[in-house]
Amino acid sequence: MNLPSYRIVNLAQAFGSLLLITIAVGYFENSLKLEPCYLCMIQRAVIIAIGMICLLAAVHNPRRFGQRVYSSLSIIMVIVGIYFSGKQLWLQSLPESKVPSCGMPVEHLFDIFSITEAITMLLHGDGNCAEVRWQLMGLSMPGWVMVCFVGFGIIGIIQFLRKA
């Protein structure tokens, strides 16, 4: 079976990540008026990082060693994304009595706390992350984002293993 070129696959992944961010901001934030929680913001940052890695890989279009480096970076980001999606799904599965308290808006976090304290708070999530505000076919938003990360991961592994 002939696979599309390395460059085309990376461009498609970069476009896919751009599409995901556009849907998140355009539809969920602007149309449905859903404010992203801390873990949602981290997942968006990971999607943007994957898109940037894939775009750089497409522009650079390296030989085999470079392809493996870019694919490895992409796979590492996928693992990070799956971790944070899983963490949010775990928070959503907690009984109400175990859900952490809600935190303050991100804008205020960086005003009040040091950068390291604010980032630590972002990475832990809060009660807002446990709230299920949207579902499709029984799967909440972090579940669908995890599906996207798994898709990016499969493509990253194929890109890593393919011959130059």
Report each predicted region and the residues it spans.
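Immediate flanking context of iron-sulfur cluster ligation sites
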Residues: 16-17, 21-35, 54-57, 120-121
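Interfacial segments of alpha-helical transmembrane regions
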Residues: 4-15, 62-84, 154, 158
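A hydrophobic membrane-anchoring alpha-helix module
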Residues: 121-164
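Iron-sulfur (Fe-S) cluster-binding segments and ferredoxin-like electron-carrier domains
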Residues: 41-57, 107-111
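Extracytosolic (periplasmic/ER-lumenal) interhelical loops and adjacent juxtamembrane/interface segments
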Residues: 93-137
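Membrane-interface helix caps and helix-loop-helix hairpins in membrane proteins
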Residues: 31-38, 90, 135
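Non-cytosolic membrane-interface motifs at loop->transmembrane helix junctions
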Residues: 34-44, 70, 100-103
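C-terminal TM-helix exit segments that contain a strictly Trp-centered aromatic cap at the helix terminus
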Residues: 23-28, 80-95
